[in-house]
Amino acid sequence: MPAITLTTLQSLKQKGEKITMLTCYDATFAHACNEAGVEVLLVGDSLGMVLQGHDSTLPVTTAEMAYHVASVKRGNSDALILADLPFMANATLEQTMTNSALLMQAGAHMVKVEGALWLADSIRLLAERGVPVCAHMGLTPQAVNILGGYKVQGRNENQARQMRADAISLEQAGAAMLLLECVPSELAAEITQAVKIPVIGIGAGSDTDGQVLVLHDMLGLSISGRVPKFVKNFMQGQDSIQSALKAYVSEVKATTFPGIEHGFSA
């Protein structure tokens, strides 16, 4: 596939073609995802759980993120690389700039920040300095201790109204993409229609502009044995990891994944 840029993703949204994203942490899987046609590789702080064995993403450092971004870059030829700013890496505007620079210099094309309206100043600062930003809303794993666990967000009308307003405000602040996690399908559809930038979902129904899953989850690999409702094991019925990756891309593009059973109601 040709090199994927923000312009590519914006064009896919306008054409109504679904965007495919998977987490990726190393060169070998970056190459495999390229071969399968995955358009965005998310170097996520989820590596703290699936690679390092922690029970949350909080222990992950910016240095560790930069290491994995560089690894993915070496195996990547076509996909856009999106990198998480880990826990407290954007606690101040100065830290936001410094840590974003480390990830971009390691090979990221875009950084992702978790939160809500309070992110506006950070997003504006980065966008003005040439750093594209994806705003991660809904269930934000870095805030798991405040949220009281990994729970669906936006189910009551006040939360839903605030999330819609925040999404529009973050777009106006300069966010180039949104990621909605564990949000009622109807609310995710409304937000996707309300903003001009691409919206990627995970546990957010089928009406977002694209989908993302944790690589290990969609390959049926789990330390805990707990499988989130929004996950499908794409290794089932396949004879290789490469076939599973291609099946994921095919099903997202065809809008057969996610199904109703993978989403949440209000």
Swiss-Prot record:
GO terms for biological process: pantothenate biosynthetic process. The active site is at 181 (proton acceptor). Disulfide bonds: none annotated. InterPro entries: Pantoate_hydroxy_MeTrfase, Pyrv/PenolPyrv_kinase-like_dom, Pyrv_kinase-like_dom_sf. Its EC number is 2.1.2.11. Mg(2+) binds at residues 45, 84, 114. It comes from the Bacteria. It is an enzyme of class 2 (transferase). Its main location: cytoplasm. It is found in: Cytoplasm. Pfam families: Pantoate_transf. The keyword Transferase applies. Pathway: Cofactor biosynthesis; (R)-pantothenate biosynthesis; (R)-pantoate from 3-methyl-2-oxobutanoate: step 1/2. Its cofactor is Mg(2+). GO terms for cellular component: cytoplasm. Homodecamer; pentamer of dimers. This is 3-methyl-2-oxobutanoate hydroxymethyltransferase. The gene is panB.
